[in-house]
């Protein structure tokens, strides 16, 4: 699975924030020792600007991912929480850079080798979600990717179910078409049979009428013969 560009950008942004915290601590140490801090100050300013641009990029990527439904609303909310934490960290770093507030203890507590580890609280995450509390950046990313994979698997299963239902619907439709064709054939057969029956009935009636007429003619002929015979029969 290809790495998520949002989390790749998020990791690099966190690294920049970590580097800024280290540079600010180093600058403060130089100031206490009376050393020149001009070069460090320029570097910190450049890093702060880069951090600002990275956060803006993260916001843009998140908005596009949510708008195009590349991620779920729940995943969008989780990423927004991480982004809010970065914005808070940026403000604290900017305040520390300007020497506003008692930042040295805060910066020292943020300097953890290799980033945040499991079980080691991150002082920059003032309201860290319960799901990600005590997790490092890599672990958070893995957790988010696992959630996305589970959601993708659920969507694949749903798509498979819908495809099967669609196929069943098509099969039922084909079967109904076949049944309709059979019914149409039966209707045509019944109609043809009925027409034949009517034709044969007419023929039978015609034959019957002819037979009746022939019988009457025979009776008349017999009567005529009888009359003739009686007429010519000699009488005493």
Curated annotation (Swiss-Prot):
Residues 233-236 are vesicular. Forms a SNARE complex with STX7, VTI1B and VAMP8 which functions in the homotypic fusion of late endosomes. Part of the SNARE core complex containing STX7, VAMP8 and VTI1B. Interacts with VAMP8. Interacts with HECTD3. Interacts with TPC1. The keyword Transmembrane applies. It comes from Bos taurus (Bovine). Keywords: Coiled coil, Membrane, Phosphoprotein, Transmembrane, Transmembrane helix, Transport, Ubl conjugation. Residues 145-207 form the t-SNARE coiled-coil homology domain. GO terms for molecular function: SNAP receptor activity; SNARE binding. GO terms for biological process: intracellular protein transport; vesicle docking; vesicle fusion. Residues 42-65 form a coiled coil. Residues 1-215 are cytoplasmic. The lineage of its organism: Eukaryota, Metazoa, Chordata, Craniata, Vertebrata. This is Syntaxin-8. The modification Phosphoserine is found at residue 160. The keyword Ribonucleoprotein does not apply. It is found in: Membrane. It holds the Pfam family SNARE. The chain crosses the membrane at residues 216-232. It is a single-pass type IV membrane protein. GO terms for cellular component: endomembrane system; intracellular membrane-bounded organelle; SNARE complex.
């Amino acid at each position: 699975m290809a790495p998520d560009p949002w989390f790749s950008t998020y990791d690099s942004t966190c690294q920049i924030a970590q580097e800024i915290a280290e540079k600010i601590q180093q600058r403060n140490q130089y100031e206490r020792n009376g050393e020149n801090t001009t070069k460090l100050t320029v570097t910190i300013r450049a890093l702060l600007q880069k951090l600002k641009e990275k956060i803006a990029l993260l916001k843009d990527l998140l908005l596009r991912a949510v708008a195009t439904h590349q991620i779920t609303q729940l995943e969008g909310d989780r990423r927004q929480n991480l982004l809010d934490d970065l914005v808070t960290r940026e403000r604290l770093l900017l305040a520390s850079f300007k020497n506003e507030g008692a930042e040295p203890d805060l910066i020292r507590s943020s300097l953890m080798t290799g980033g945040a580890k499991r079980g080691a609280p991150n002082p920059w995450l003032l309201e860290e979600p319960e799901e990600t509390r005590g997790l490092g950046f890599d672990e958070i990313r893995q957790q988010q990717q696992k959630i996305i994979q589970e959601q993708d698997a659920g969507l694949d299963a749903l798509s498979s179910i819908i495809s099967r239902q669609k196929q069943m619907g098509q099969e039922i439709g084909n079967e109904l078409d076949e049944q309709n064709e059979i019914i149409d054939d039966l209707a045509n057969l019944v109609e043809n049979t009925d027409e034949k029956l009517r034709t044969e009935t007419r023929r039978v009636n015609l034959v019957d009428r002819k037979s009746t007429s022939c019988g009457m003619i025979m009776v008349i002929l017999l009567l005529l013969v009888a009359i003739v015979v009686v007429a010519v029969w000699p009488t005493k």
